Amino acid sequence: MIRLAGNSQDGIQTAGAFLARLAGRSEHDVMTYMTIPATISGGPSIFQVRIGSGEVLSAGDEADFLVAFYQHSYQDHIGFLREGGVLLYDSDNVEPNLDDKRFFYVGVPITGLTVEALGGTAKDKGKNIFVLGLIAKIFNLDAEKLKRVITEKFSGKDQSVVNTALMAFQAGYAYPVGNVLTKHYRFEHIPRASGRAQITMDGNQALAYGLIAGGVRYGAGYPITPWSSVMEVLRRELPKYGGIFVQAEDELASVSIALGCSYSGYLAVTGSAGPGISLKAEAIGWASMAEIPIIICNIQRGGPSTGLPTNVEQSDLHQAIFGSHGDSPRVVLAPASVEDCFYIAIEAARIARKYSTPVFILSDTSLATRIEAFDEPDLSKLMVDPKPDLTPRQTHKPYPIDQITHHVPPGTRILDGKYPLLAGLEHDEMGHPTGSPKLHMAMTAKRRNKLRKLAEEIPVSEIYGNQEGDTLLVGWGSTYGPIHDAVKMARDNGEKVGALHLRHLHPLPNGLEKIFDKFKRIVTVEMNDQGVYGFGQLATILRARYCEPKITSFTKTDGLTFRVKEILDGVFKGKSFLARHIPREGAEVIHQAGAENVKTLKEVVPQGVG
């Protein structure tokens, strides 16, 4: 695992993304993690890349290779470098404690050499690419392929920008780092089992393309971090499929536009982060009452209020399920990985159409911004081409008591001349407003029962690890990878533990109680607060649903993703585990005191670094 630590204006996210995309194109598995400040003025920032030829599920607990651009970068992140790791630092700005013999130190005057290489034309603005050249040399990366990635990134800019970036890269690549680092490393290429081409993208991109594959052609939104990049992809791509995405004047307008598109016969999407979802709440409640299909993406961030706009949290689960006045049924899904962002969008579109209901997709900042490589989807089997059914009907009831609502697009001929209405007021089967107590009870049950029917068709996720035993870890969203790595490590140390990951959060799949019966305790792992009653948001739902006192939770609210060590320490309090690194079959890193022991790192690391 490589961690770049500097300031947000240094372009370390760009450099890290280049590494990730190179890894994906080289058929390696990859996962990234980044933090950026919420202020316009910028501040400390990191970008880390974990690369391997095996399955990479989490971003990693400790770095094998740390790049420090500033003194604060060194001081804040040296604790994340594992013993025997390499510290590459800008000797123009950093003075490390060389008496600390746990690490190997490589000091390079990065700032000065960058300015010198670029002739002062861009000052030190190319030092991120200079460092990329250094890393490429140290890790024996494909320099020509990396240059192509750089060129593609800046292809829309003036040619001088491309040339400057390539000059900075070449200067870093040519630096005689071998004079101070005697061992170079390379990633062994292991063909992927699927044999299919890989694509590399972040979670928001995967979500946007999944929506398109699922047949979404229209949508509207309002910019907010971290949802905005979904909008950017949809605004660029939807016109290629005959659709359009509108940037509305506010959140209420955006959800209203999307609802109009859906009623016209084309399933539409809107989205935001927590604050924007609060503003959309009334219209989403209207969609529940009118039974209009719509997809609502909530890219969760730290809250409440403006909160932590660039940090991760899973604190909007209750908002998604209960965030409306009255009994307002809706479906809530959560992707587990970047790849799953693509497939969960297709699932959301299917459910919205079949059950004429609002469907929430709860992603989060970690999934939105991290880059992963995965097998290219077979669009020939997945792509949905939406075509509204304008076939004339003899008659049409939009709200039959004993059936699921399916609206006909406006303009469809109704031969008996009885055209239905669309109302947010309680209504009868034709949509006419009514205050009948009997009808309100019947319609409330109708809207509720379609979610019960959905629960019957949701498959229960498979348990990873022990199928029965002492502890079952239950997660949702981006906690998938760290939980699975924690379970593997715990089982390697003799614990009888399994993991269950939920993609369908509301309604829950039927049959979970049979799984819970097989374990002595159930612990949800969540990035939200334990609340007044001492349980995370998912744990609260599960305890209410199953009345099971053995359900507890391990939660945190620091705005950072879970580390494997955190989960192990939080769930198995008082127990120590022999391995503090994440087990990786075929990867052997020997750690001993003294910087000279970096020489014990294997030249060929079959499963990657970290």
Regions inferred by a protein language model and the residue ranges of each:
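Active-site cofactor/cluster-binding pocket
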Residues: 1-214, 218
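Flexible, low-complexity linker and terminal segments
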Residues: 200-204, 208-212, 344, 349-610
